[in-house]
Swiss-Prot record:
Biological process (GO), any one: mitochondrial electron transport, NADH to ubiquinone
Null mutant phenotype: RNAi-mediated knockdown impairs mitochondrial complex I assembly. Reduced body size, reduced fat content, fewer embryos and an extended egg laying period. These phenotypes are exacerbated when nuaf-3 is simultaneously knocked down.
Pfam families noted in UniProt: CIA30 (PF08547)
Single annotated GO MF: unfolded protein binding
Signal peptide: none
GO cellular component terms, A-Z: mitochondrion
Key words, A-Z: Chaperone, Mitochondrion, Transit peptide
Main location: mitochondrion
Protein's recorded name: Probable complex I intermediate-associated protein 30, mitochondrial
Organism, scientific name: Caenorhabditis elegans
Record bears the keyword Methyltransferase: no
Keyword Lipoprotein listed: no
């Protein structure tokens, strides 16, 4: 007989919320959407009860330590449910089945890729020609679209923005919704109005899949069609230590609007270091060996609907681009606020 006693979940979860795009009913249905989110959250938590919120650090990073039992796809802060051993044991067969199948497929792909005739293998070891491009992420199937998660301030109960990510008839992804800079009158939230989509492509048993295969290319390549707004591309590089969890490298994505596609080639040398979205004084080049995810964020402080259509994301190589890093950096004095 199994005795139930509480086990803390230190990695919170969140549900994925979608909304109608460019719908006049979206504003009037805000209360319904909020109730639906709360209902889904409670259903997802099972019989667990929400505990008292943990304190948040200076950059909004949770003080809750990592727990590998419960992955946190969206990095939601302060959601810390209480699960019993009985619930964990009941979930084990399903976890073993799904993750085991994923591991088997991973091993199979590893053996199939070991061939000198494979173009990807040659690219990974540095044999990349001038003007060569590789497309890594498309959105022509639901399975590929499911690798991407979305979020906005209303998911964190910090605003009223909404967003969705759906397939189009052309086999592309449409990231759309509504940005609202209206601030909640709770005495805590100071700014609002953002939405994002982020890659959550992981290996079996929730292991990170790094983008190290991009290290021999010079540019990030995107084919997009926007609405004239300025978005932001983010390369996320969280490491094992908690003070690196907010590390990312960013670059603006300016869209033209209108019916025409634009091919954006952004040099990796021009990505600047940010922590939780804040530009840092100490700048250094992005290390793609540590980059595990890519995201697109909209936070331009403009109320209204938005729409970004994405055909593919990949990398491009330009051998004439010899710039290592585009921004100034400096050597800190021996005695400084960061230590030796």
């Amino acid at each position: 007989m199994i005795t139930s006693f509480p086990v803390r979940n230190f990695l919170p979860r969140v549900t994925i919320t979608s909304c109608a795009f460019f719908s006049k009913e979206s504003t009037s249905a805000a209360g319904t959407v909020a109730e639906k989110k709360e209902s889904e959250l409670q259903k997802f938590a099972g019989k667990s009860n929400l505990l008292e919120k943990k304190k948040v650090g200076i950059f909004g990073t949770s003080t809750v330590p990592i727990n590998t039992n419960f992955p946190n796809p969206k990095g939601v802060v302060d959601y810390d449910p209480d699960f019993s051993i009985k619930e964990l044991v009941a979930e084990l067969p399903n976890t073993r089945k799904t993750q085991g199948a994923k591991l088997s497929e991973e091993i199979k792909n590893a053996f199939n890729s070991v061939s000198i005739e494979k173009t990807e293998l040659l690219e990974d070891i540095g044999f990349v020609r001038h003007n060569e491009a590789r497309v890594d992420y498309r959105f022509d199937t639901q399975e590929k679209l499911d690798l991407w998660k979305i979020g906005c301030d209303s998911d964190w109960k910090e605003g009223f923005s909404t967003c969705s990510l759906v397939n189009s008839d052309r086999g592309t992804a449409v990231f759309s919704g509504n940005i609202s800079t209206k601030v909640l009158k709770d005495g805590r939230v100071e700014r609002a109005g953002w939405a994002s989509m982020k890659l959550e492509d992981r290996k079996a048993f929730n292991r990170k899949k790094f983008l190290s295969k991009w290290r021999n290319f010079s540019h990030l390549l995107l084919k997009v069609r926007g609405d004239g707004r300025s978005y932001k591309i983010m390369l996320h590089s969280p490491l094992s230590m908690d003070f690196t969890w907010g590390d990312s490298f960013s670059h603006p994505l300016h869209t033209h609007g209108g019916p025409y596609w634009q091919y954006e080639k952004i040099p990796f040398s021009k990505f600047f270091h940010t922590v939780a979205g804040r530009i840092q004084d100490r700048q250094y080049r992005v290390n793609l060996e540590d980059t595990s995810s890519i995201g697109i964020v909209l936070m331009d402080r403009i109320d209204g609907d938005f729409r970004l259509e994405i055909d593919y994301i990949g990398v491009y190589n330009d051998t004439t681009h010899v710039e290592d890093f585009a921004y100034e950096t400096y050597t800190l004095p021996v005695f400084n606020t960061h230590g030796f």
